């Protein structure tokens, strides 16, 4: 079903692989905030692993994956042992919404289904609807925080961005963890400042 790409032959296979890849990069410098617990912490062990292969960029492909192809990919990720899988941007299309429903109905009880949405109320509501009934779900919201996107594209001040982040977080909680009809699901929230690499550190934290 999938077209395999020819692999490039290395002159000396594995010769340049690092024995300990963790030592390749300098550790991220923590941010000293006395009233916060996590910004100053350092990563000292392997983090949680999440597959995000099934969402976002796929929408821009000239020949995007069909639902049967997405299903095959999803089950391959389960075979590989992923416990957190970001499956879609369910508010982007009916295809993504329908595939999300398939993932929810076929995921093992120890696998979290993650979905992505912008910080806009109607999109958040549609996104939460897509994972209703999941055993474990992660709602991943993102918001423009870099100066270019926040100021030029969306015409928002830093105060506007913070207010929107709080508003959206409260909305997600009201639709999930605090909603009486959503208690069968173990809910988690992920928030991403966009683009984090171009966002001033003090503002992002």
Predicted features by range, described:
Residues 6, 10-60:
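N-terminal amphipathic alpha-helix/helix-capping segment at the start of soluble metabolic enzymes
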Residues 27-47, 114-141:
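Glycine-rich, aromatic-flanked loop segments that form ligand/cofactor-binding clefts
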Residues 48-49, 59, 84-86, 110-116, ...:
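Structural preference for beta-strand elements that scaffold enzyme active sites
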Residues 50-80:
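Conserved N-terminal beta1-alpha1 strand-loop-helix module at the mouth
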Residues 65, 69, 95, 156-164:
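Alpha-helix N-cap and loop-to-helix initiation/capping positions
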Residues 82-111, 115-116, 143-156, 192-196:
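Glycine-rich, proline-tolerant flexible connector loops at the mouths of alpha/beta enzymes
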Residues 122-140, 144-205:
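Hydrophobic, small-residue-rich alpha-helical packing segments that form membrane-like cores
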């Amino acid at each position: 079903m999938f077209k395999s790409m020819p692999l490039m032959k290395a002159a000396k296979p594995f010769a340049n692989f690092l024995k300990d890849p963790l030592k390749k990069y300098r550790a991220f410098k923590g941010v000293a905030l006395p009233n916060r617990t996590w910004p100053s912490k350092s990563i000292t062990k392997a983090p949680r692993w999440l597959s995000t292969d099934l969402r976002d960029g796929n929408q821009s492909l000239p020949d995007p994956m069909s639902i049967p192809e997405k299903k095959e990919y999803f089950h391959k990720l389960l075979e590989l042992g992923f416990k957190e899988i970001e499956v879609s941007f369910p508010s982007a299309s009916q295809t993504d919404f329908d595939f999300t429903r398939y993932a929810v109905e076929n995921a093992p009880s120890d696998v979290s289904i993650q979905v992505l949405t912008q910080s806009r109320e109607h999109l958040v509501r549609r996104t939460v609807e897509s994972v209703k009934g999941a055993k474990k779900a992660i709602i991943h919201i993102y918001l423009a925080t870099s100066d270019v996107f926040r100021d030029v594209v969306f015409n928002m001040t830093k105060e506007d961005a913070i207010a929107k982040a709080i508003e959206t977080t409260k909305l997600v909680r009201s639709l999930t963890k605090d909603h009486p009809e959503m208690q069968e699901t173990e809910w988690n929230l992920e928030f991403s400042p966009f683009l984090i690499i171009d966002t001033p550190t003090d503002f992002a934290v």
